[in-house]
């Protein structure tokens, strides 16, 4: 039924749970549904973030409610599918790793994929519906600042459109638009195995190029969205 998703993701009535900060007992409000998906390690690492980072993260997560609700409603009325919605928010563990374990620390507010959605569209409506989503988000003050159309790049083994948006508070979200076929290939074991093999090779060597061609073939053997080259004009 139409209400199934909404209940499962707890977004019809978002519940913000109050978490006290150890340092100065200021209150942080967290989206309860997201927090409940965290492991013990996630909770531990969340508390290892600085207070500012925790507040920023919690605040960020309370803004994603509006986008999630909009995309769920959009999917219901437009034959679209939201894939892996429960994974839309980067966990504290991967966030902590990105901030503290890498050689180059990322600035917290420049992490574009703390909140990431995957939207699967029909090839015939694909371009039109991406425009509908970006227009509607623009109305909600989410402006697009990066649009990558991989369908028109024959040398890169991936098909899809990756769009990044930010609002006036510099919060960022990413939406990946797929067709069912491009999503299935991206998630396939075959593509993953080839990627893992290629990743450790020297770019340009014979074996690297051979594996790359196999990956490119996976992506070229599918129906391409109508008028996909026109998408640059967003």
Segments predicted by a language model, with ranges:
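Non-Sec secretion/translocation targeting segments of pathogen effectors
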Residues: 1-9, 119, 175
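Charge-rich, low-complexity segments
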Residues: 3-111, 127, 131, 189, ...
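Long beta-strand-rich cores associated with HINT superfamily self-processing modules
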Residues: 100-234
């Amino acid at each position: 039924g139409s209400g199934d998703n909404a209940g499962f993701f707890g977004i019809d009535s978002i519940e913000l749970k109050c978490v006290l900060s150890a340092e100065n007992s200021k209150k942080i409000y967290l989206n309860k549904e997201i927090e409940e998906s965290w492991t013990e390690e996630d909770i531990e690492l969340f508390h290892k973030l600085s207070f500012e980072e925790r507040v920023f993260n919690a605040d960020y997560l309370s803004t994603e409610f509006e986008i999630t609700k909009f995309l769920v409603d959009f999917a219901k009325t437009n034959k679209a599918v939201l894939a892996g919605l429960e994974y839309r928010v980067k966990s504290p563990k991967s966030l902590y790793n990105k901030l503290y374990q890498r050689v180059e620390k990322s600035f917290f507010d420049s992490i574009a994929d703390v909140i990431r959605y995957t939207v699967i569209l029909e090839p015939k409506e694909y371009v039109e519906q991406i425009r509908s989503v970006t227009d509607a988000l623009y109305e909600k003050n989410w402006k697009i600042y990066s649009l990558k159309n991989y369908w028109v790049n024959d040398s890169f083994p991936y098909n899809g459109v990756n769009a990044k948006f930010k609002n006036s508070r510099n919060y960022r979200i990413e939406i990946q638009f797929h067709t069912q076929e491009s999503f299935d290939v991206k998630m396939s074991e075959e593509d993953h195995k080839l990627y893992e093999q290629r990743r450790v090779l020297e770019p340009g060597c014979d074996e690297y190029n051979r594996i790359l061609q196999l990956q490119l073939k996976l992506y070229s053997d599918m129906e391409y969205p109508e008028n996909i080259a026109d998408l640059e004009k967003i």
